[in-house]
A protein has these predicted regions:
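N-terminal loops that bind phosphate or other acidic moieties
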Residues: 1-191
Length: 191
């Protein structure tokens, strides 16, 4: 990925998170601590500052700066999960992987860090179909929206949301929603 596309992607994601931070926290209320939006907004603001201060020379360096900022600034599960994803993406980018390979490396790191699989009402439920769509050259906003909405009718079995079990049905997973924002930002950055 070109460095300028990676930077634009992260800037677009930061803007989307900032715009939707209250909604993200509302989604997190019934399932978690109600702070996903505020935490992720703080982390992405730090990530953008890190990009500016480190002046990355490659997409891999952009992903590294984002990873380190999210791990250090975002509490709860989302910081380590997103941070791990971007670290995996950095390594795949350094290895010359294409976009599908880079995103798949991010997905694998999320699965490893969170011990999660598809169908458990986690970020994996968005990352997995997005990776498959990218492999087919068919990633669209509709694919992203369908993946996010798929988490609504599933009972959470992983993470903080699993504590409410069946009562999590009817609620969109906040990490899935923010992942949807990440991939919509990717589509915009690639235009």
């Amino acid at each position: 990925m070109d460095k300028t596309v990676a930077v634009k992607w992260m800037q677009d994601f930061d803007q989307k998170v900032e715009t939707e931070k209250d909604h993200l926290s509302e989604l997190d209320g019934p399932l978690g601590d109600g702070d996903h939006g505020a935490n992720l907004a703080r982390g992405m603001a730090a990530a953008i500052e890190a990009i500016k201060s480190t002046e990355p020379q490659s997409a891999a360096e952009v992903f590294k700066a984002v990873s380190m900022a999210l791990i250090s600034k975002v509490g709860g599960a989302s910081g380590p999960l997103y941070g791990s994803a971007f670290m995996g993406m950095m390594k795949a980018e350094q290895a010359g992987q294409d976009l599908a390979g880079v995103l798949e490396a991010g997905l694998e790191m999320i699965k490893k860090r969170g011990h999660a699989q598809a169908g458990e009402k986690t970020m994996v439920d968005v990352w997995h179909p997005v990776v498959e769509a990218v492999k087919q050259g068919q990633l669209t906003n509709d694919v992203i929206d369908q993946a996010v909405l798929s988490t609504k009718e599933v009972a959470a079995t992983k993470g903080r949301a699993s504590y409410v079990g069946e009562r999590s049905i009817g609620h969109i997973d906040p990490g899935s929603y923010s992942s949807g924002l990440l991939f919509k930002a990717l589509l915009e950055a690639e235009e």
